């Protein structure tokens, strides 16, 4: 991917503005998950070690533009960065018109979404951001799908614009998994609705050899194949779309394997009785809440034969133990596989954490919406802007 990399630049004495994704959950001033802060540290350390005057900004929450809000302030992030880096990290509240920072120093610039014009990618604001630095570094993959002043406009205006190590690692992994995958490529797509992942399914079916579905998505595909699904979650208005996706897969020799057995209950509640049934034995008041053991074994065998695996979404209601076995079997199969594996999406990350397999997945994307849009085959605005500047 043709993008100027921060690690290839001479940064000594340069003013470097880094856009990170430090949008961490905060409860009563306490950071409850510092994963994104930890992920940002290598980029910051490289810039400091190379003698740059480093400025970092990020969004946090959804503040009203032009209004400072303590609830959405990066103050807790500045404090935690100071502790992790072992240096003072001052927080600058009013920074758009200029920042004092010396080589070897780091300042955190207050929540960029508080700046008027940020969300609509205002050119005047983007130019002010660009004027702050000699080098702008985009390192926030999680916001690369948003064309905003700090993620897109400034890339177009800055003297030099580069991709940071975190962003480039994400793009390199996604490119390896989707744009230039070693075949066979298998994708797992779970979730409640076909409608939210329709573009994803339509794009993947043109690239994969196997497309495993789970959750409400699988129920819609079962209904499209003529099976009764009782009162299970599905989308009746997308049955024809599901049939078209199945037809498209068959036309290029790909397969969308359907469950042969499922785990059902009469109510969607923890502690209810779970029953394994074949898919042709579903009755009117059944709720399908997981794939069955026979299906899980079959899917695990398919994963074992894949050279590349892309995973987005669980295949059952894994939050309830009675309906978690399918997702667990697949998670462990992906972990045990010799394939290059990429996983992303909030529920997927929660499943990976639950089963303790994070260190056995080749790459775990923290990108959320950006990860999904990349899987859909969309061009991410920040990435497109960086590519345009590389020429």
UniProtKB/Swiss-Prot annotation:
- Keywords linked to the UniProt accession: ATP-binding, Cytoplasm, Glycolysis, Kinase, Nucleotide-binding, Transferase
Which annotated residues bind substrate? 21-23, 36, 59-62, 113, 146
Is Transferase found in the keyword set?
A: yes
Superkingdom classification of source: Bacteria
Q: What is its main location?
A: cytoplasm
Give the UniProt subcellular location, in the record's own words: Cytoplasm
GO CC list: cytosol
Q: Which family does it belong to?
A: Belongs to the phosphoglycerate kinase family.
Q: How does it assemble?
A: Monomer.
Protein name in UniProt = Phosphoglycerate kinase
- Organism whose genome encodes this protein: Xylella fastidiosa (strain 9a5c)
């Amino acid at each position: 991917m043709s993008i100027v990399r921060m690690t290839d630049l001479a940064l000594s004495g340069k003013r470097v503005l880094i856009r990170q994704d430090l949008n961490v959950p905060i409860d009563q001033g306490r950071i409850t998950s510092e994963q994104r802060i930890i992920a940002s540290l290598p980029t910051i350390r490289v810039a400091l070690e190379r003698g740059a005057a480093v400025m970092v900004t990020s969004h946090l929450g959804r503040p009203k533009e032009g209004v400072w809000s303590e609830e959405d302030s990066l103050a807790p992030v500045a404090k935690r960065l100071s502790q992790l880096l072992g240096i003072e990290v001052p927080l600058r509240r009013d920074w758009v018109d200029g920042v004092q920072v010396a080589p070897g120093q780091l300042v955190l610039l207050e929540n960029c979404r508080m700046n008027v014009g940020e969300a609509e990618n205002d050119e005047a604001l983007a130019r002010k951001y660009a004027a702050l630095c000699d080098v702008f570094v985009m390192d926030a993959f999680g916001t690369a799908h948003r064309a905003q002043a700090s993620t897109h406009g400034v890339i177009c205006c800055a003297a030099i614009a580069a991709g940071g190590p975190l962003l480039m690692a994400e793009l390199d992994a996604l490119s390896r998994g989707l744009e230039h995958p070693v075949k066979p490529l298998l994708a797992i797509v779970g979730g409640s609705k076909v409608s939210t992942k329709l573009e994803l399914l339509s794009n993947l079916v043109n690239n994969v050899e196997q497309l495993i579905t789970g959750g409400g998505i699988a129920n819609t595909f079962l209904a499209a194949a003529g099976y009764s699904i009782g009162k299970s979650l599905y989308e009746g208005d997308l049955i024809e779309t599901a049939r078209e996706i199945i037809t498209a897969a068959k036309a290029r020799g790909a397969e969308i394997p359907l469950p042969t057995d499922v785990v059902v209950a009469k109510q969607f509640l923890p502690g209810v009785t779970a029953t394994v049934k074949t898919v042709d034995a579903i009755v009117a008041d059944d709720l399908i809440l997981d794939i069955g053991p026979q299906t899980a074994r079959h899917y695990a065998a398919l994963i074992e034969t894949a050279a590349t695996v892309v995973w987005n979404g669980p295949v059952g209601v894994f939050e309830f133990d009675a309906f978690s076995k399918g997702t667990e079997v697949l998670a462990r199969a992906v972990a045990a596989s010799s394939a290059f594996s990429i996983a992303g999406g909030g529920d997927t990350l929660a499943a990976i954490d639950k089963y303790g397999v994070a260190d056995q997945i080749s790459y775990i994307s923290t990108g959320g919406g950006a990860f999904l849009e990349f899987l859909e085959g969309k061009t991410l605005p920040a990435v497109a802007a960086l590519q345009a500047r590389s020429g």
